Amino acid sequence: MGRIRSRVGGTRNLIFIGALLVLMLVLLLDIYVEDKIFEPLGYFYLFFAILVVFYGVYPLYVNRRLTKYYWDRTKRHWLSVFGLIFIIFLIVVALIGPFLTQDPTEVNFLRKNLPPVSFSTQQSVYDLEAEKFVTRDTPGVWQHPLGTDDKGRDMLAMLVSGARVSLQVGLLATLIAIIIGTVVGVLSAYLGGWADNVLMRFTDIMMTFPFFLLLVFIIFIFGPSLAFIILAIGLTGWTGTARLVRSEALSLRTREFIMASKSLGASDARIIFRHLIPNVLSSIIVIATLSIPGIILAEAALSFIGLGDPTVTSWGVVLNAGQRSLDTAWWVAVEPGIVLFLTVLAFNFLGDGIRDAFDPRSQL
């Protein structure tokens, strides 16, 4: 059985490396073509998707008995099931939605401030025959089912574009923060001594800075690029993960299987990657799931106050535009607010369900 698992794991690693090579080849080709296949952040998004498929979904498929056990515990919380369904729907929309909707940056002042379908609003329009502005009842149209903003941009297209931006920021920044926090926490617990003191004191110093104000300061200095926003959030949001992983790893460091591995001559790297990290993985998954909504909110808040990337259409940008016209076009602010609220709620529900599923002490 051990040989079979080792062989399956080796095959998975080879296929994963092959997929990364194909992705790198497409990236190199994309540099020299005029019509880009993906935007730069799209490649990071694809890398994350490949990583999740090979090291998240595939292990669940192989170990079906354990997967069924965790799924049975998770699905007892109907709110966590709702969160999972909504997140899957959001991911599908973010992936294929931009190919089915209009250009979110296309401006058409002839169709500005159109309400959603089934709603109507009073608008002042210019009558060419009377040669003056008149007030007319303007209904919603199916060409723009969720309405348009004050520049005539399609709200559905902007919400879909915002979903992609929010998921890119949430997933990639969380990945960066989780990797840094896991490395710091595991090394601090395993090495102990002066290394533990240095790493934890540095973590304490990072935690003393207000997270959002630190983000505002960094982005104000270096500029509001979306890639830099992701990097800034990831580099400043790892402290909670580090402390949690350290506490879990400290309880494992003196366990019998760790001591047995040391006595058999296993290297420190092997002990860390084969024993420590796999045994704290459940806690890492929980904190990652619960960190994503906070990161999505942070990006939306940065965009709302004007520190987001002006070249992308995010929910925070749409909210900023909508709050200036609440009296005439309420849907411009309400729709992205509802989607943002549901997204944050879904990730929190899913995180709570996963936490209860992984916790053997929970009463279900």
Where are these regions (language model features)?
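Alpha-helical transmembrane segments of integral membrane proteins
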Residues: 151-364
